[in-house]
Amino acid sequence: MLGKIKYIIKHYYLTIINIPHFIKNQILEFRNYINDCKYKFSHLAETNYQLGFDHLYKGNLNDALLRFKLVNKFFNSNDSKVYYQLGLIYYLKNNYRQATVYLEKSNEKYKTIFINFLKNYQFITEIPQEIWAQYRDLIAQYYPTIFNNEKNIHLPYRFVNETLKHISDLSDNYSILELGSNIGLVGYEVQKRFPESFTLTGVEISSFMNEIQATFYQNTKIYNHIYNIAIDEFLKQNSNKFDIILSFCGLSFTNNLIKYFNLIYSCIKKQGYFALCLPNSVKTQFSAKRKEFIFNLNEVNNFLQKNNFTILTSDEIILAENNKYSIIVCKKIT
């Protein structure tokens, strides 16, 4: 009996003296649990942010919106980068008011330029370079689908083929400049169809379009030279003259075409050619839905003639009821 009592006393004594160690271990376990939860939450935030980013660049706007809103609500509230991405999404979804709301909450580099553009887009004559470059970055991966149509008209091919029809007397080793070379849609057709031999130079403001060109055209070198720069900056700095200048929807960031036609004219050799494709409309104006200017064909022709170009052909191509383009080929006679 006495032995049993001693055992019980010893048991409780050991239990009591171990309580501090027990409490300490429990605290450590709880701290580890909290740290683990923090890591997982941080990881979830990063994962959802990256998924949102991927969806945004693939054009899956609703999925991108969901991911960034999850990050904003549950993980990183009031995050400047998240607000900026939400602003971009609403811009692409044509909700300019909501885009402005989120951009105003951000502190990113082009915030002020973007907000000013969104509030005054009805009055602009040119899309700011920073916005145009970012927009083309965002649409780069699905850019070819913009020209999809039920008529199976391959617009880049149509543009190159129409240009080639009206070009003659090319010198050996002639030079071609493409303004707004995108992911290489037109450059690829030029390499396939234009007679050898020539050098092809591309100018594209979107760094991402230049970067993913190799993804679309693997093992194919399209351009001899490519410049990641705004078109007007290139034309002002350029000292070379080209036999042919092409622009496939590369000038739709501006309605001040006279300015650009004048710069282009000075960069073309005598008897050289200028071919362009532009989105068409009854009235020249900025399209909030398309994020670019759309042009009246007669006005464009008049601007070309005022800049001393001789128009060889000027046609409207109808892909769909509200998706029309003009293809114009002209020549510098003097």
UniProtKB/Swiss-Prot annotation:
PROSITE patterns xrefs: TPR_REGION (PS50293)
Cited InterPro entries: SAM-dependent_MTases_sf (IPR029063), TPR-like_helical_dom_sf (IPR011990)
Domain of life: Bacteria
UniProt cross-references to Pfam families, sorted A to Z: Methyltransf_23
Protein name: Uncharacterized protein RP092
Organism name: Rickettsia prowazekii (strain Madrid E)
Organism phylogeny: Bacteria, Pseudomonadati, Pseudomonadota, Alphaproteobacteria, Rickettsiales
